[in-house]
């Protein structure tokens, strides 16, 4: 079982390390656009040691029709996107 009681095939992880904010936003949008319907959750690894720009983008300015909710991860370097 994955987080929130989901099976492994319902969770996807994306890593934004090494990207700037505009690259990361476009790349994340593409990942959510192409995520199969069975994917219910995306763990976004944005890091936190290098600053909060990516984290702030994910939490505040990233919007997508498929994203129902954003939850801060247990690790301060990640955010969970709950999909519709």
Segments (PLM) and residue ranges:
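Long, charged, low-complexity intrinsically disordered regions
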Residues: 1-84
